[in-house]
Amino acid sequence: MERTGHAFADRQRLQRALTHASARGANAGTDYERFEFLGDRVLGLVVADMLLAAFPDAAEGELSLRLNALVNAEALSEIAEHIGLPDLIRAGSDVRGLEGRKRVNLRADALESLIAVLYLDGGLEAARAFIHKYWQPRSQASGAARRDAKTELQEWAHQAASAVPAYQIDSREGPDHDPLFTVSVRVGAFQPATGSGRSKREAEQAAAAALLLREGVWNAA
């Protein structure tokens, strides 16, 4: 993994971190979810610290919006694709052929697992260097501090339809420690929009953002 900028001392642990439970073998994937759990926490810590330093005058609400934009599954999947991580994931053919949201989540999970082994192999500084390299440019993006989607949708719904957004959980998939919620939102007579996330709140935010984008209230920048 040259793009991590780190020479791994424990290559076997790196291989385990990129082996999904669907891969063949009695012990395949036994560490994958544990590494993913740790990597999620390391990523959140480093990005939060990075944002505090970069935006010293930002309020907690703005920092939370920026953090969520940087650590959601879509952002992680894009970074994973950029560094060529999908080609290194060992998984069963049924998983490797996933499309849509499930493929996004697979790549995001693998990137979190990679961050965990960076931390375990080289300490916090190794993980921090990698995260700063790929997340810091994104932290300055114009859309990183976009207003809370649910709040903006509620205001727009009142003005456009004299209505209140109605959210509904359509599905909940995945293990208890890493669920995937799909939520739809309806505003008056407008067509509903859907969104997914690792929490009910994240899915509601994604659905609200999807409706705002579709109706032209937000642009795609």
From Swiss-Prot:
InterPro entries: dsRBD_dom, RNase_III, RNase_III_dom, RNase_III_sf. It holds the Pfam family dsrm. Its EC number is 3.1.26.3. Keywords: Cytoplasm, Endonuclease, Hydrolase, Magnesium, Metal-binding, mRNA processing, Nuclease, RNA-binding, rRNA processing, rRNA-binding, tRNA processing. CDD domains: DSRM_RNAse_III_family, RIBOc. Residues 1-123 form the RNase III domain. GO terms for molecular function: double-stranded RNA binding; metal ion binding; ribonuclease III activity; rRNA binding. One of its GO terms (biological process) is mRNA processing. The active site is at D40, E112. It is found in: Cytoplasm. GO terms for cellular component: cytoplasm. SUPFAM superfamilies: dsRNA-binding domain-like (SSF54768), RNase III domain-like (SSF69065). Its cofactor is Mg(2+). Mg(2+) binds at E36, D109, E112. The keyword Transport does not apply. It catalyses: Endonucleolytic cleavage to 5'-phosphomonoester. Homodimer. Belongs to the ribonuclease III family. PANTHER family: RIBONUCLEASE 3 (PTHR11207:SF0), RIBONUCLEASE III (PTHR11207). Digests double-stranded RNA. Involved in the processing of primary rRNA transcript to yield the immediate precursors to the large and small rRNAs (23S and 16S). Processes some mRNAs, and tRNAs when they are encoded in the rRNA operon. Processes pre-crRNA and tracrRNA of type II CRISPR loci if present in the organism. This is Ribonuclease 3.
